[in-house]
């Protein structure tokens, strides 16, 4: 297998670094994006959620000012200081009282820390929260109600209060900086202070504003950290007085928050547009000028230096007593006129503000970059080397550190490998054969290293091994998390725990340490310790075990090396016994006699070293292969015992290596063959399609990492070989972490969990890979199990998600999959579990008892559905009004509203009882709309989709005149009677044709005082022709729509003429039946002629009732009325478009609900 390179692709480790550092310190923090106009929260850790009591889904996309934690005891000054910190680029600490979700109050120290990108621009803010004390301990009420808590609905988080940062003309203030009055600069001081003049003239009654006199000129010391005496001595006693009163519809922010009907106001920093209610910011040259201004000695500035006539006011300034302090702690010098306005934000909170409004870095911020970095490091308790930047960056490699996969390290490893092989061969040989010869020739003249070339080589090997130890202390490694570790300290610890001891023993130069002692045999034995390096050689060569030829070669080399070692031992045994034997029966004496070189009586002479080594190697090879010829035989007991051991070793090696070579190769290369086959396919794919190099490198790196992660195992292929019950158990084990720790799956039965586990699929994504693109169809729900991702809209990061977060769309609220409103991109190597919407809904249909719990406990951290891209999709107002449905069949949902309890024959009167709000199955509008008073079905009705069956394709409504109170003798329920006196409990398929006609009776005359009731819908076998589908602008032109409307208008004109005549005939027939009980409808006057009627109508008597039969007859007439020849054919598929809705009608939630003037209940 290739060398493990680890995660070397550029990763965005911003979130991982912050979490790793903060979680160990039990921090509570949030991360906000400084480039969106509301500084929305894009990440919050579990500690913050536990602190405030809100879930992550409720906190995400909230303003980072945390105004949803404000309450009665929250200081406005502290809140303003936090807002000011978001304007600058320096950190600030503020003490403020916050409220939890349960209403309990606590005092918190908030650290606002900016985060910069590689260009030095502030792109994010980290807000760290530290609890100082509980308010209950200092005498506050037990529970103060948090009136600003957000709604528990996850959809409400996107429309809650937002924090808009607007900066007015900064260039104009920059140009005016040089025009400050020269009289105010007579003192030699630092022109860094900021003086705030505030006019106490109240603002306009329609706005609620809080002038930021304190906010625009404060630093960390004056933000509740400096002594009160110094601040009072510098500023004066009047600095704590309020500077502006809050006026508007509500007397105070608290009163406004107490009103449940009031829309959530947004806290925004906006420029004051009134010259009478804004604060001017001007510069002070020194502390003397500040004292003069505090005492009123400094005259007001000229008009060109401010925006209006301002009254000097003693305000909170820098907590300093000298000019040097002003130089050191000067604040932003060009802050424009700012007020804190509570306004309603109707726009998209995620859209970035213009460049002029988004730039919040002061002109001198570039000069303070190094100071900011030091302070950020102090606040975060992080080292400067690990302070992250929010960008894709390669792993940090320390200086003088060698990558373990670099070319230099590869060459060096091969060099060390050759030296180790040399050591393994020559160390036993020199210890057995050469030491005896050296002793025998010790009387020879001393010629140094020239006579001993192997001694020089041994010295070089020792030096190389020592250098290798030093290199290993600076070589990176891959940890258990597949991360490349380059820190010298961690590398040293890892090396000490691993191969350091073996390398150290193998590198000891024993011949130099024992030089001159004369014990050459001891030196030779100690040198055998170098053979310990063979363990590392085996580990290095294991990567080549995937090649068949290499394995055969390695096996042969191993066999030869073992034979070499045994030959050295065989010679050492014969050489040791030779001087002590009286009878010359050893194998050496026999060898000398055979080759004609016998030993003399003094033990000298005999065969040469070459003859001895070759003979010993011949004996060991023949013994290991069990092919002994007997020409070299053991004679002494020691030689026979050694021969037995050699035979045992040889039998094992021969049987395990040579006897099973094919089996070994097949077993070792099964995975390797699959790897190379798949890799070959990838390369052929790259070559065939001519993929460019950057993309080719991504493909290869992803394949290699995925192969090392899964080892080339195809889970689907493996699972298909097992029965379904075993497949479910395996999938349950693989997804056990998700099913155990994810809240929506708690409480599910084991059978339900097994069914869900079968539907989950695991996705692995490298850094920089885009999982979902903007506009893609959302067909699955994603659960993050490892890594972190970011969600972008354009180039703006709107959310950062990590482990255990969920993103997608709420499947129970939409019948059809929506489209993504942003890009989802991986920051690190991520593992995600995804389940398709069809599979999830199918499982929940099988377990309806678990479905309620699942939908109620599912909290999607970020909703990717883009409602603006889908015409007629329900908005947040509809969803908050009860637009909650459950899946009853596949892709069919049942609306749970108050109307479900009514019987099919009951009549619900508009204006009596609770009106249905939102896109219900039988009502899509409300009376009093801008185009009529009749309820109508909008195009966003989920029941009108094609995949819900023909019975749900349309929702016809029946319109009947609103009746007066029913007489006591009338039948209950108010159903109209047929001619036979029976109740009509069935609906004509065309009886709802008038549901889409806006105020059709207005053609007869004045319809004032008449209301229409909504009858329960009945399934129609075929859709009405008047239910015109909403045509797509891309498929039908505007002229087709206009011609269709003209045809319908002509139909209505003919309908008026015939309806007047038919009504007279019908009413005369009804008046003859005196035995019938009068129905429950009030009398209707005879309608006059229509505005376009060609002939006058015959006068008739008063209309006593209007039955369903009459309306049914009229509906049938309309259904079978032919269209003119020039009118286009009406399509029958797609969502229906009611005639009461104009062509440019927007979403229903955007239209305010009005009650008609003739409504009796208004």
Swiss-Prot record:
Glycosylation sites: 600
Biased composition (Pro residues): 964-974
Free-text description of this protein's post-translational modifications in UniProt: Phosphorylated on serine and threonine residues. Phosphorylation by PKA inhibits ion conduction.
CDD domains: CAP_ED, PAS
Cytoplasmic side: 1-405, 474-497, 544-549, 662-1162
Catalytic activity from the UniProt record: K(+)(in) = K(+)(out)
Ranges lying in the membrane without crossing it: 614-634
Biased amino acid composition, Low complexity: 932-943
Effect of residue 186 to R: In strain: BALB/c
Subcellular location as annotated: Cell membrane
Modified residues (Phosphoserine): 239, 241, 245, 285-286, 322, 353, 873, 876, 1140
Domain PAC: 92-144
Alphabetized GO MF terms: inward rectifier potassium channel activity; voltage-gated potassium channel activity
BP GO annotations: potassium ion transmembrane transport; regulation of heart rate by cardiac conduction; regulation of membrane potential; regulation of ventricular cardiac muscle cell membrane repolarization
Biased composition, class Basic residues, residue ranges: 885-894
Residues the record lists as Omega-N-methylarginine modifications: 1017
Effect in UniProt of substituting residue 455 to T: In strain: BALB/c
A GO term from the CC aspect: plasma membrane
Subunit structure: The potassium channel is probably composed of a homo- or heterotetrameric complex of pore-forming alpha subunits that can associate with modulating beta subunits. Interacts with DNAJB12 and DNAJB14; chaperones DNAJB12 and DNAJB14 promote tetramerization. Heteromultimer with KCNH6/ERG2 and KCNH7/ERG3. Interacts with ALG10B. Forms a stable complex with KCNE1 or KCNE2, and that this heteromultimerization regulates inward rectifier potassium channel activity. Interacts with CANX. The core-glycosylated, but not the fully glycosylated form interacts with RNF207.
Family: Belongs to the potassium channel family. H (Eag) (TC 1.A.1.20) subfamily. Kv11.1/KCNH2 sub-subfamily.
Stated name of the protein: Voltage-gated inwardly rectifying potassium channel KCNH2
Originating species: Mus musculus (Mouse)
Primary gene name: Kcnh2
């Amino acid at each position: 297998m290739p060398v493990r390179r680890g995660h070397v692709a550029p990763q965005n480790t911003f979130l991982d670094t912050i979490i790793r550092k903060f979680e160990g310190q039990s921090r509570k923090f949030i991360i906000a994006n400084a480039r969106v106009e509301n500084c929305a929260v894009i990440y919050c850790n579990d500690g913050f959620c536990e602190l405030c009591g809100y879930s992550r889904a409720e906190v995400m996309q909230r303003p980072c000012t945390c105004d949803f934690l404000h309450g009665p005891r929250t200081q406005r000054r502290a809140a303003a200081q936090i807002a000011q910190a978001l304007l600058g680029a320096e950190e600030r600490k503020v003490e403020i009282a916050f409220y939890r979700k349960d209403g309990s109050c606590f005092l918190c120290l908030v650290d606002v820390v900016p985060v910069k990108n590689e260009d030095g621009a502030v792109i994010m803010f980290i807000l760290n929260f530290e609890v100082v004390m509980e308010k209950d301990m200092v005498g506050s009420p037990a529970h103060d109600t948090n009136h600003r808590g957000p709604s528990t609905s996850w959809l409400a988080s996107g429309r809650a209060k937002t924090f808009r940062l607007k900066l007015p003309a900064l260039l104009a203030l920059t140009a005016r900086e040089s025009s400050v009055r020269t009289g105010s600069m007579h003192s030699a001081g630092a022109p860094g202070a900021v003086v705030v003049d505030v006019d106490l003239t109240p603002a306009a009654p329609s706005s609620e504003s809080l002038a930021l006199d304190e906010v625009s000129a404060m630093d960390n010391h004056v933000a509740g950290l400096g002594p009160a005496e110094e601040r009072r001595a510098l500023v004066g006693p009047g600095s704590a007085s309020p500077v502006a009163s809050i006026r508007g519809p509500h007397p105070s922010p608290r009163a406004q928050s107490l009103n449940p009907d009031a829309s959530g106001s947004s806290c925004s920093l906006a420029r004051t547009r009134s010259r009478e209610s804004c604060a001017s910011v001007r510069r002070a040259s020194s502390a003397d000028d500040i004292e003069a201004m505090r005492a009123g000695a400094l005259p007001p500035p000229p008009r060109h230096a401010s925006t209006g006539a301002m009254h000097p006011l003693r305000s909170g300034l820098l907590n300093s007593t000298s000019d040097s302090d002003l130089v050191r702690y000067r604040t932003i010098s060009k802050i424009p006129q700012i007020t804190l306005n509570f306004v309603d934000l109707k726009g998209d909170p995620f859209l970035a503000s213009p460049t002029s409004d988004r730039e919040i870095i002061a002109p001198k911020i570039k000069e303070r970059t190094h100071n900011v970095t030091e302070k950020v490091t102090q606040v975060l308790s992080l080292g400067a080397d690990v302070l992250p930047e929010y960008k894709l960056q390669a792993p940090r490699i320390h200086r003088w550190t060698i990558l373990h996969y670099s070319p230099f390290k590869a060459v060096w490893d091969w060099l060390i490998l050759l030296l180790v092989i040399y050591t393994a061969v020559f160390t036993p040989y020199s210890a057995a054969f050469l030491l005896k010869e050296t002793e025998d020739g010790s009387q020879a003249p001393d010629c140094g290293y020239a006579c001993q070339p192997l001694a020089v080589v041994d010295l070089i090997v020792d030096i190389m091994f020592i250098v290798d130890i030093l290199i290993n202390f600076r070589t990176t490694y891959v940890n258990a998390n597949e991360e490349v570790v380059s820190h010298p300290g961690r590398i040293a610890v890892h090396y000490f725990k691993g191969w350091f001891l073996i390398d150290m023993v193998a590198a000891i130069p024993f011949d130099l340490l024992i030089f001159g002692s004369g014990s050459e045999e001891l030196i030779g034995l100690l040198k055998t310790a170098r053979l310990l390096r063979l363990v590392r050689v085996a580990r290095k060569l294991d990567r080549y075990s995937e090649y068949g030829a290499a394995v055969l070669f390695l096996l042969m080399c191993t066999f030869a090396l073992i034979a070499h070692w045994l030959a050295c031992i065989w010679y050492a045994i014969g050489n040791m016994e030779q001087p002590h034997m009286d009878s010359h029966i050893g194998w050496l004496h026999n060898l000398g006699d055979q080759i004609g070189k016998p030993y003399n009586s003094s033990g000298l002479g005999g065969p040469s070293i070459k003859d001895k080594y070759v003979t010993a190697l011949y004996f060991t090879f023949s013994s290991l292969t069990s092919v002994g010829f007997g020409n070299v035989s053991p004679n002494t007991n020691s030689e026979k015992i050694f021969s037995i051991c050699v035979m045992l070793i040889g039998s094992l090696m021969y049987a395990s290596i040579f006897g099973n070579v094919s089996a070994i190769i097949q077993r070792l290369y099964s995975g390797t063959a699959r790897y190379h086959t798949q890799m070959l396919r990838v390369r052929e794919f790259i070559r065939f399609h001519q993929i460019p190099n950057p993309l080719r490198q991504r493909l290869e790196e992803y394949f290699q990492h995925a192969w090392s992660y899964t080892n080339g195992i195809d889970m689907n292929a493996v699972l298909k070989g097992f029965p379904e019950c075993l497949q479910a158990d395996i999938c349950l084990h693989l997804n056990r972490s998700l099913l155990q720790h994810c809240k929506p799956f708690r409480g599910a039965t084991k059978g339900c969990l097994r069914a869900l586990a079968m539907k989950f699929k695991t996705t692995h994504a490298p850094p920089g890979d885009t999982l979902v693109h903007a506009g893609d169809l959302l067909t699955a729900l994603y659960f993050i199990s490892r890594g972190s991702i970011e969600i972008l809209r354009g180039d703006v990061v709107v959310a950062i998600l990590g482990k255990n977060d969920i993103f997608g769309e709420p499947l129970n609220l939409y019948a059809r999959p929506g489209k993504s409103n942003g890009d989802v991109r991986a920051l690190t190597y991520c593992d995600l579990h995804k389940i398709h919407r069809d599979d999830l809904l199918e499982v929940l249909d099988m377990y309806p008892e678990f479905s309620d719990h699942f939908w109620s406990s599912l909290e999607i951290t970020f909703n990717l559905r883009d409602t603006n891209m889908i015409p007629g999709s329900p908005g947040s107002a509809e969803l908050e009004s009860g637009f909650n449905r459950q899946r009853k069949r596949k892709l069919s949902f049942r609306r749970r509203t108050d109307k479900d309890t009514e019987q099919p024959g009951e009549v619900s009167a508009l204006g009596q009882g609770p009106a249905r709000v939102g896109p219900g199955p039988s009502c899509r509008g409300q009376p009093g709309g801008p185009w009529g008073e009749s309820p109508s079905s909008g195009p966003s009705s989920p029941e009108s989709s094609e995949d819900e069956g023909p019975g749900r394709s349309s929702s016809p409504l029946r319109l009947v005149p609103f009746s007066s109170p029913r007489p006591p003798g009338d039948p209950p329920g108010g159903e109209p009677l047929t001619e036979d006196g029976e109740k009509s409990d069935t609906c004509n398929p065309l009886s709802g044709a008038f549901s889409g006609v806006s105020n059709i009776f207005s053609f007869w005359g004045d319809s004032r005082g008449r209301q229409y009731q909504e009858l329960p819908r009945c399934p129609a076998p075929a859709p009405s022709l008047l239910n015109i589908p909403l045509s797509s602008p891309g498929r039908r032109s505007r002229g087709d729509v206009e011609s269709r409307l003209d045809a319908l208008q002509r139909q209505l004109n003919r309908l008026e003429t015939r309806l007047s005549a038919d009504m007279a005939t019908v009413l005369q027939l009804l008046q003859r039946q005196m035995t019938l009980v009068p129905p429950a409808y009030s009398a209707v006057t005879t309608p006059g002629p229509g505005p376009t009627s060609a002939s006058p109508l015959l006068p008739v008597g008063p209309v006593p009732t209007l039955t369903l039969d009459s309306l049914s007859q009229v509906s049938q007439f309309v259904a079978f009325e032919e269209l003119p020849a020039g009118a286009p054919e009406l399509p029958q598929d797609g969502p229906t478009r009611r005639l009461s809705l104009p062509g440019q009608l927007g979403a229903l939630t955007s239209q305010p609900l009005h009650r008609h003037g003739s409504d009796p209940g208004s």
